[in-house]
Amino acid sequence: MKAVVLLSGGMDSLVTTAIAHNEGLQLAAMHVNYGQRTWQRELESFRSIAGHYGIGELLEVNADFLGTIGGSSLTDHTMAVSGADLQGTAIPTSYVPFRNACFLSMAVSWAEVIGAQKLYIGAVEEDSSGYPDCRKVFYDAFNKVIELGTKPETGIEILTPLIAMQKAGIVEKGMELDAPFHYSWSCYKSEGKACGVCDSCARRLRAFELVGVRDPIDYDVRPQYIH
């Protein structure tokens, strides 16, 4: 069976790819440039991870209209990328308005054309930045949209294997599957060394700390987030 994996190059999408690969599926991987600050580094990670898993069917999509729309510190250089707030409950400035719906729409189109029946995305609800399009209820609803908006015989289903996991559990799952964490990139701000202080870096570093393993990528600073 064929499956499309939405592969940003980050830790969550890496582990999701490892899970799908472990299922013995024929994988096709899609990466989206949406005008984000670190798109070149993320693309490098995408290609490295796809190569590691021998994924030959790749689609690199330009969706930089999301950058033109703006409204997010990931795409709008007039907005500062906020520092980590691991206890915060407000939706952070890094939220890209309705981004995942755009990604899923493009991925479903491709899946329908290439005959894929599964669509994997590394969304995390439990231990994440609180993005509204990373909730299980959102993906349940989108599966209904796919059912209503594609040919009856298509049968595409979105799978979110990490949705209820904590970040530390995601690291442990990746280690269990021997995922190449050194290829992944999570930083919102930097393409050289990861900054270590944005929300994404902080959640990643804390997860590795909780597991008791050193994160293999380079950081400009490497704060301790467990006190």
From Swiss-Prot:
<comment type="function">
    <text>Catalyzes the ATP-dependent conversion of 7-carboxy-7-deazaguanine (CDG) to 7-cyano-7-deazaguanine (preQ(0)).</text>
</comment>
<dbReference type="InterPro" id="IPR014729">
    <property type="entry name" value="Rossmann-like_a/b/a_fold"/>
</dbReference>
<feature type="binding site">
    <location>
        <position position="198"/>
    </location>
    <ligand>
        <name>Zn(2+)</name>
    </ligand>
</feature>
<keyword id="KW-0479">Metal-binding</keyword>
<keyword id="KW-0067">ATP-binding</keyword>
<dbReference type="GO" id="GO:0008616">
    <property type="term" value="P:queuosine biosynthetic process"/>
</dbReference>
<feature type="binding site">
    <location>
        <position position="201"/>
    </location>
    <ligand>
        <name>Zn(2+)</name>
    </ligand>
</feature>
<dbReference type="GO" id="GO:0008270">
    <property type="term" value="F:zinc ion binding"/>
</dbReference>
<comment type="similarity">
    <text>Belongs to the QueC family.</text>
</comment>
<dbReference type="GO" id="GO:0005524">
    <property type="term" value="F:ATP binding"/>
</dbReference>
<keyword id="KW-0862">Zinc</keyword>
<dbReference type="Pfam" id="PF06508">
    <property type="entry name" value="QueC"/>
</dbReference>
<feature type="binding site">
    <location>
        <begin position="7"/>
        <end position="17"/>
    </location>
    <ligand>
        <name>ATP</name>
    </ligand>
</feature>
<keyword id="KW-0436">Ligase</keyword>
<feature type="binding site">
    <location>
        <position position="187"/>
    </location>
    <ligand>
        <name>Zn(2+)</name>
    </ligand>
</feature>
<dbReference type="GO" id="GO:0016879">
    <property type="term" value="F:ligase activity, forming carbon-nitrogen bonds"/>
</dbReference>
<keyword id="KW-0671">Queuosine biosynthesis</keyword>
<keyword id="KW-0547">Nucleotide-binding</keyword>
<dbReference type="InterPro" id="IPR018317">
    <property type="entry name" value="QueC"/>
</dbReference>
<comment type="pathway">
    <text>Purine metabolism; 7-cyano-7-deazaguanine biosynthesis.</text>
</comment>
<feature type="binding site">
    <location>
        <position position="195"/>
    </location>
    <ligand>
        <name>Zn(2+)</name>
    </ligand>
</feature>
<protein>
    <recommendedName>
        <fullName>7-cyano-7-deazaguanine synthase</fullName>
        <ecNumber>6.3.4.20</ecNumber>
    </recommendedName>
</protein>
